[in-house]
Swiss-Prot record:
Converts 2C-methyl-D-erythritol 2,4-cyclodiphosphate (ME-2,4cPP) into 1-hydroxy-2-methyl-2-(E)-butenyl 4-diphosphate. This is 4-hydroxy-3-methylbut-2-en-1-yl diphosphate synthase (flavodoxin). It is an enzyme of class 1 (oxidoreductase). Pathway: Isoprenoid biosynthesis; isopentenyl diphosphate biosynthesis via DXP pathway; isopentenyl diphosphate from 1-deoxy-D-xylulose 5-phosphate: step 5/6. GO terms for biological process: isopentenyl diphosphate biosynthetic process, methylerythritol 4-phosphate pathway; terpenoid biosynthetic process. The lineage of its organism: Bacteria, Pseudomonadati, Pseudomonadota, Gammaproteobacteria, Enterobacterales. Its cofactor is [4Fe-4S] cluster. PANTHER family: 4-HYDROXY-3-METHYLBUT-2-EN-1-YL DIPHOSPHATE SYNTHASE, 4-HYDROXY-3-METHYLBUT-2-EN-1-YL DIPHOSPHATE SYNTHASE (FERREDOXIN), CHLOROPLASTIC.
Length: 372
């Protein structure tokens, strides 16, 4: 029931990664990267499909060798989500995966080779209508820029990016997006701000090597949140030393928190105190797990008492406010019913699923069907 975010997005060009539009007002795409050995085709395919199930728009796959390129061919045949091939050092690998139907090529200008090799990759991408991501990273800047600036700075990352943007411009190639990633939040944010003022190509956002599941999610939320709130960014990846599935979940949570793009349920829950009339924490944790398959956007407030419960329910799609033995249930801000506190999880799940089906007619079901 909350309004969309009052964020004016930066104007950018439109490109396509497979069938996914990037830039020019398209929904911000959420992506992740596999962490299996690419030569293990079965494991990589299984991980990509797991990422698809939680909503990944795009998946990146590292292709470090020609053997991995051959494995990529088999992987591409078994998945439907667009795949980006991550290429370092050997430009010939980019040419090989282009033959196998890659949807986007990610190259690092700091290590892909000389201008002639880049030209070869660009010509191939143009012929096969494959977009490119220029991926600048603070940890792998070109040697001359390291010497010039002494350490990674926003100006160094910008100069690296613009060097290769200019090269693609000279080659009359405009089907590309750019990233300027760093593990330091301030360095990354300022680099993206500078770049956003210089070009109108789509920008891929990320705080690289952000850390483990908790710290990395926090760091990414701060860095990406700052940029997104300023209208900067057309696609993103949350980089975590964790299951890649968690990257997709955190990515959507960031977009959901800024009301930029919603997928699934936005739970609003109190941190609990002695006033709670039912187990709020247990209820929320259980429902988050049970309802991961719901993709219909909706706000669900779960508040343990009547202090803030009615107010939150007023602006939620569905809401519950803790009461003695029974708790008030609200729909679209209107109190409808009372739910038994001892059976709260099952009752709420049924009502949430029924509401989701009402909002999505193709999956319409009834509360009675769910409560049997």
């Amino acid at each position: 029931m909350h309004n969309e975010a009052p964020i004016q997005r930066r104007k950018s060009k439109r490109i396509y990664v497979g069938n996914v539009p990037i830039g020019d007002g398209a929904p911000i795409a959420v992506q992740s990267m596999t962490n299996t050995r690419t030569t293990d085709v079965e494991a990589t395919v299984n991980q990509i499909k797991a990422l698809e199930r939680v909503g990944a728009d795009i998946v990146r796959v590292s292709v470090p060798t020609m053997d991995a390129a051959e494995a990529f061919r088999l992987i591409k045949q078994q998945v439907s989500v667009p795949l980006v091939a991550d290429i370092h050092f050997d430009y010939r690998i980019a040419l090989k995966v282009a033959e196998y139907g890659v949807d986007c090529l990610r190259i690092n200008p700091g290590n892909i080779g000389n201008e002639e090799r880049i030209r070869t990759v660009v010509d191939c991408a143009r012929d096969k209508n494959i977009p490119i991501r220029i991926g600048v990273n603070a940890g792998s800047l070109e040697k001359d820029l390291q010497e010039k600036y002494g350490e990674p700075t926003p100006q160094a990352l910008l100069e690296s990016a613009m060097r290769h943007v200019d090269h693609l411009d000279r080659l009359n190639f405009d089907q590309f997006k750019v990233s300027v990633k760093a593990s330091d939040v301030f360095l990354a944010v300022e680099s993206y701000r500078l770049l956003a003022k210089q070009i109108d190509q789509p920008l891929h956002l990320g705080i690289t090597e952000a850390g483990g599941a908790r710290a990395g999610a926090v760091k990414s939320a701060i860095g990406l949140g700052l940029l997104l709130s300023e209208g900067i960014g057309d696609t993103l990846r949350v980089s975590l030393a964790a299951d890649p599935v968690e990257e997709i979940k955190v990515g959507f949570d960031i977009l959901k928190s800024l009301r930029i793009r919603s997928r699934g349920i936005n739970f609003i829950a109190c941190p609990t105190c002695s006033r709670q009339e039912f187990d709020v924490i247990g209820t929320v944790n259980a429902l988050e797990q049970r309802l991961e398959d719901i993709i219909t956007p909706m706000d669900v407030s779960i508040i343990g008492c009547v202090v803030n419960g009615p107010g939150e329910a007023l602006v939620s799609t569905l809401g519950v406010t803790g009461g003695n033995k029974k708790s008030g249930f609200y729909e679209e801000g209107v109190r409808k019913d009372r739910l038994d506190n001892d059976d709260m999880i099952t009752q709420l799940e049924a009502r949430i699923r029924a509401k989701a089906s009402m909002l999505d007619e193709s999956r319409r079901i009834s509360v009675q069907q769910l409560e049997k």
